[in-house]
A protein has these predicted regions:
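N-terminal regulatory/effector-sensing and dimerization cores
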Residues: 1-74
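Short, Lys/Arg-enriched, Trp-marked, Pro/Gly-tolerant hinge/linker segments that flank
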Residues: 73-75, 95-160, 170-182
């Protein structure tokens, strides 16, 4: 399954991860993954269901046609190219649709090829199993700028900062600061999709300047904000 929105921002949550997906990205969801899709703002969602027998087109770089299910066993966020965005509305999505004609089969094959070529984006946010830490993480996802310190967030769930720091390491393999940066990036991407200026995004997320925010983005994803936050027209 591929979920994407032509307008607005969606959030998809599986058992141990959540993804905030703006119109410039799509989310690949493998079979048998229970998930919940939440509309964060007015959004037009399109969902593509990929047949189990589907194969990517073969080419010089990949001479053997591969299955997307074999290549992508886990959820992943993909960049949406202008071509992919234009192709999707031409697929017949009506319930009980007739057998696709040759034109639709060609479009579907090209959609799969665009998905194969799409660059993955590190937008997944891991979620813990521990109930206290899960409650804290969900609160941060809902209000990422309410507090900045670990001490304040730990008090919110009635735990000591030391306990919360230990849980972040044992449950998520990262520090509180590293995990919160991923949340801020996801929310920044949603704000960029609404065409908000970089200075406004930086200020909203608690950064003293746009340059400080730019440095964080480069350090975290290895791309400048102009590239990472690029959205399809």
């Amino acid at each position: 399954q591929v979920a994407m929105s032509s307008t607005g921002v969606i959030r998809m949550s599986a058992a141990r991860s959540t993804y905030i997906v703006p119109p410039s990205r799509a989310l690949w969801i493998p079979p048998d993954v229970e998930h919940v899709v939440t509309v964060l703002e007015d959004a037009e969602i399109r969902t593509l269901y990929v047949h189990p027998c589907a194969r990517f087109l073969a080419d010089a770089q990949a001479p053997d046609a591969a299955s997307p299910f074999a290549m992508w066993p886990a959820c992943r966020v993909l960049e949406v190219s202008p071509l992919l965005r234009e192709l999707v509305p031409h697929l017949d999505t009506a319930p009980g649709a007739r057998e696709p004609d040759e034109r639709e089969r060609c479009i579907a094959a090209l959609v799969l090829d665009e998905l194969r070529r799409a660059a993955p984006v590190r937008l997944g946010i891991d979620l813990p199993a521990d109930a206290r830490l899960r409650r804290l993480c969900e609160a941060i996802l809902d209000h990422p700028t309410r507090w900045t310190s670990l001490e304040d967030w730990a008090a919110h769930v009635g735990a000591s900062p030391r306990t919360v720091a230990r849980l972040f390491r044992s449950e998520l393999g990262s520090s509180f600061g590293q995990w919160r940066q991923q949340v801020l990036l996801a929310h920044a991407l949603a704000m960029a999709a609404r065409k908000q200026p970089m200075a406004t995004i930086a200020a909203e997320l608690g950064y003293a300047s746009a340059s400080a925010f730019t440095a964080m983005v480069r350090r975290t994803v290895g791309q400048p904000p102009s590239r990472f936050f690029a959205t399809a027209p």
